[in-house]
Regions:
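Short, intrinsically disordered, charge-balanced linker/junction segments flanking boundaries
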Residues: 147-150
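Conserved short secondary-structure transition element at the edge of the structured enzyme core
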Residues: 62, 66-71, 109-145
């Protein structure tokens, strides 16, 4: 399941997610709502289900969500700095809170590279621009979104 109300204008209610989590073909959810209260509610309702994984989208919340019980993050910034996010996850796994705070601060700084544009597609536009600037991909987006230009 994917909860991203800013893009699809539909919000997956926690009770609905809990019901769907019992379906054999549904194994997890990525939440990109950036709503910590919502994510905590999901953890409360689904934390006792070892067969259902919960992931967070916004990397600014990865540290907090994993500390609360999330299985991890699906973070766009990991495409730019994979070692930073791998180090963050290792620090979270090892409960090294001092290291988590330091790395999470780096994640926040990294986000400034690609979170400067408003709108629902702003992060995607910023990430694609930065990745193309580094020669990792072409700066092409699906219509109607337009790519950023340098």
């Amino acid at each position: 399941l994917y909860n991203m109300p800013s893009h699809v204008k539909v919000f997956l209610e926690p009770a609905t997610v809990k019901t769907l989590a019992n379906h054999s073909n549904i194994i997890g959810l990525k939440d990109s709502s950036a709503n910590m209260t919502y994510f905590q509610t999901l953890l409360y309702h689904l934390g006792d289900n070892p067969d259902f994984s919960l992931y967070v989208g916004p990397e600014e919340l990865t540290g907090e969500c994993v500390l609360l019980g999330a299985d991890g993050g699906v973070n766009g910034g990991a495409n730019l700095c994979p070692e930073l996010f791998a180090s963050l996850y290792r620090a979270l796994r090892d409960s090294d809170l001092e290291q988590v705070r330091r790395l999470q601060a780096e994640v926040l700084e990294l986000g400034k590279l690609y979170r400067s544009r408003p709108g629902a597609a702003g992060v995607i536009r910023g990430l694609k621009y930065e990745l193309s600037r580094r020669g990792l991909l072409k700066n092409v987006l699906a219509f109607p979104a337009l790519p950023l230009r340098g």
